[in-house]
Structures are given as C-alpha cells and as structure tokens.
Amino acid sequence: MLHLYNSLTRKKEPFVSLRPGKIGMYVCGITVYDHCHLGHARSMVAFDVMVRYLRSQGFDVTYVRNITDIDDKIIARASERDVSIDELTAQYIDAMNNDTHALNILPPDHEPRATGHIETIIRLIQRLLEKGSAYVSENGDVCYEVDTFPEYGKLSHKDIEGLVSGSRVEIVKEKRSPLDFVLWKKAKPGEPSWPSPWGEGRPGWHIECSAMAMHELGEQFDIHGGGLDLQFPHHENEIAQSEAATGKPFANYWLHVGMLQVNGEKMAKSIGNFYTIADVLKEHHPEVIRYFLLSSHYRSPLNYSEENLLNAKKALIRLYQAVKDVPPQTADSKLDEYWQEQFNQAMNDDFNTPVALSVLFQLAHEVNKSNSPALAHTLKNLAGILGFLQKDPESFLQSGLAEEEKLVIEQLIAERLQARAERNWAKADQIRTDLLSKGIELEDGATGTTWRRIAE
C-alpha cells in the first residue's frame, strides 16, 4: 500500500483517495518572469514521477500545474525590458515548455493561468468577505484576516505569536494584523488591472492558486504539492482562505520537495546562484539530469555539482549497457513480477526513488548475468516510470561527444582495421587500449566495429 509523508501531519500516512481509483493533484507551477532553473526542474521531475507511478498502479490521476502570469516580479521585469507583460510571459512560457519537453516531463492535464481565472478569483474573495474572513483595507486592497482562522499555522507549524511580534510595525497601518495578506490589490498607474466590486485591481498570489485548484479539482482534492519554500506563507495561506470559504479540508495530503542547493545554499534567482535548465542541457544529456534529480529522496536537500552529474551519467551508462543488446519487446512480453514488486515497495514508501534506483541496479546485474530479454524489458519498463532508459542505447552511449571527437574515434577505428588487415596485432591492440582508457569501448561484429562510451 502507498504511504505518503504528509507535511500537514508530519508523518507518513496510508494514502486513501477521496474517490476510489481517482486522484486529484494540484502542484504550484512557476511565475513566468525568467527562465526555469534546475531547482524548478527538481520539483517538476519529482511530481512527474509521482504521476507516472500512480498511473502505473492503475489510478486515474487528474494532474493540475498552474502558471502564475501576473505578479509583481512579472510587472517589474516587463518594465525593465520595456516589453508588454503578454510578450514577456509568452516568451518564458515557451521556454518552460521547451525545458519540460527536453526533460521528458509529461504535460499536466490542466495548466491554468491566473489571468484566465479572474472571475473565479473574484467570486472566491466575495465568499470570504461574506463570511467575515476578509476586509477592505484603508488603501483599497482586500485582505484576508488571519485571526479569523484559528488553525492558521497548522501546515508550517510556525510560532504565529512569534511571527507577529517580529513583523515590521509599518505593515499594521494598512492591515489589521501583520500576517494578514492581500487577496485583491488596488490598481496602480501603469499596471494591468481588472474590474471588481472593489474597483480596478488584480489578484494576490495566494488566492490565485486556491481559485484555480478549486476550479479544476473541486473544493476538496487529494494531493497538493510544491517546493518546500512554498510551505510558508503560500501554502499556509491557501489552506486558511480555502477552508474559511468552504468549511472543508482543502487538500488531504501536502507534499513538499526539498531544496536544490549550491554549496549548501538554496538555488535561487534572488541569490544569483542558479543554473537555468537550458544552460545545463547544453552540457548534459536530459536523462542524466533526470537521474541526478531523482538520486536523492524528493524531501531531502540535493546538492548541485558537476561531480554529482558525472556520477549520474556513469550510472546511466551502466544501465544502458545492460539493455543495449536486448531484442525489441513483443506484445506478449511479460514483466518479471519479483522485480516489479521490489520496485513498487520502494515507490510505495513515499516515492523513495533512491531505493528504486538501487533496485534497478540489482536488476541490471541480473540482466548482465543472464542476458534475459524478460528481465531487460522489465528493467526498461521500470526505468520508464522514472522517465529514463527510453533512448536508443547506442545513441545514448555515444552521446556527449563533439562531432570532432567522434570523427577522431572513427579515424582510429579505421586505422585499427587497417592494422588488423596488415596483421599488425600490436598496433590494433594499442588503439583499442588507448580508446578504452578514454572511456570508449570497441565491439567487433560480423558487420564491422562499433563503439560506445562506458562508465569510467
């Protein structure tokens, strides 16, 4: 049975969906004011694997991942570049789609944008005002009153009294409490705005996600996810406003992905230590990046380094070598039940991908020993749930080399062939040895000599 670590209760719990066989999952997507970095990729890959696994277990998953396309950062960036907000967001949505496609991240079933749900957002704010959970502040903003929700802090387990006492005094001038947050921002000159019962304005970030999640999945759903940095205040605020409006639990399970770090610090645009997905893809195969991102449990911090990416590459090479000579899968090919069960046990333990990867390596060892097509197909199938081992083995094993390097290898193979024709075995053996020392393995066959990269 699947067990998930629920941030709300701080413990692993058996997963029971609201509707048998069906799962509603909402994940906070990106704010499109810049290119996605590898920290975004970690979250997207983690939830991609969760969806793939749940579907492999027979669940009908409705996966929603939003796009925040109106925000202070977007407005500021568009102004800096002297472009329209629509032009800016379209550019980065296209870039995100290119990144996710390259990383073999499945598209969500629904990808709502905040600007497409203004009426839904306004209706939700009206409900909160009617229930006395929100108020119109002196400056014309509509704010949520945190003190009206006694359970505020139940997700992040923050010391709310401490947060209030540590807040800046000037915020209180516009809000009844420093922790109150904006649901609707009064329009400012030159900023995009929409008509509302409270005048022209635009939605706050937190209310956008609640409104879009409810629109796509209903007032209650199974899983809400996002990065650990969103737990407070974003997800805390989502719970407060959603449950105040409906009187029902918002999401039953809250899953949070740990931070990707660089030298012990969170990778973030604000710090300036981030690597864009596009830049990392220039240097590393997409499957290598996926493997690296899954090499640590999704809740644990993961350190970015070239060494860790190299280790991921070596690991994938070993897996590809195990399946490189396997005949194509046929319609009646069956998967090995024992290894399926071992893999499922790992994934049922809160999507424990490091243990699942160790199962794949044990299976690869058995494939190498037995050369069993059934085991090899099982290996490819299980790895496919993690989103890799899906390329042509020869193509992958030759990837990562510049065309000039490939030409040099082909030239050396030709020289070796000539040496063998001249019965100069010493030279032929030396060429093989030299290439092997560079991580290039030669294989002689009836149709000629082929080569592949190997784990050094």
UniProtKB/Swiss-Prot annotation:
Sites where the protein binds ATP: K269
EC supergroup of this enzyme: ligase
CDD domains cross-referenced by the UniProt entry: Anticodon_Ia_Cys, CysRS_core
Chief location category: cytoplasm
GO biological process, one term: cysteinyl-tRNA aminoacylation
EC number: 6.1.1.16
Compartment(s): Cytoplasm
Residues where Zn(2+) binds: C28, C209, H234, E238
GO MF, any single term: cysteine-tRNA ligase activity
Cofactor note: Binds 1 zinc ion per subunit.
Substrates-to-products reaction catalysed: tRNA(Cys) + L-cysteine + ATP = L-cysteinyl-tRNA(Cys) + AMP + diphosphate
Keywords: Aminoacyl-tRNA synthetase, ATP-binding, Cytoplasm, Ligase, Metal-binding, Nucleotide-binding, Protein biosynthesis, Zinc
Cofactor section: Zn(2+)
Designated name of the protein: Cysteine--tRNA ligase
Species name: Legionella pneumophila (strain Corby)
Gene: cysS
